Amino acid sequence: MFSKKIVLAFTLILFGSSATAQGDFEGIWTANHPPRMGQPDPSAVKMTPAGLAEFEAFTPEKDTQLRCLMPGIPLGLIDPYPIEIVYQEHQILILYEHFHQVRRVFIDGRTAPDHWQPSLGGYSTGEWDGDTLVITTTHLSPDNNTWTAGYPFSGDESAYVVERWSRDGDELNLTGEVHDATNYEKPYVVNGHWTFAPDGEIWEYECIPEYAGVK
């Protein structure tokens, strides 16, 4: 009987510590990004010849947001609007005020189905590395950019994005790596920061083409 109690106690400690190891990101967070909206210094961006050609051919009209299309991934990883994070058993939802984006990060071990087509938001799966959430997003559309300054994104089958989300007190931190060998010699790295807003709100967002820059 005594040994059974020890085993039971050990089991509770083991699984209890595993559960609490997962970070608590639920709630509304307001943007508090570093300079340049968390984008790297231009000198740190190493483009391939193909990427440089795309960059030099960029005009502001190619920004998807000017066509009232949501920025998606990787362009929408960092923006000045609040986000809300909701935990569910099989997924984590990231709700963006910007363009009312709803992002599903599946955490139940599933992989992208064969029929999944490239899209602005792609297909995101997540796993816990201690209290850090690691998100991998694939199936991304070429109708996107890495950043509004003209940094390109190929949308190739081999292109993907890895994010690491962690919490430090009331601060939520993101490091994102854009893996796009067509355009970049090494991953393009962005950093985002948000502050917990227990009384925060997600407001309605509306994109009106004539005000967005569409002629």
Where are these regions (language model features)?
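N-terminal signal peptide c-region/cleavage motif recognized by signal peptidases
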Residues: 16-18
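Short, linear, compositionally biased motifs with a strong N-terminal bias
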Residues: 12-13
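Bacterial N-terminal signal peptides that target proteins for export
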Residues: 1-8
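Hydrophobic small-molecule pocket/channel-lining residues, especially in calycin-type beta-barrels
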Residues: 2, 20-215
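Short amphipathic alpha-helical "recognition" segments used for binding
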Residues: 8-9, 167
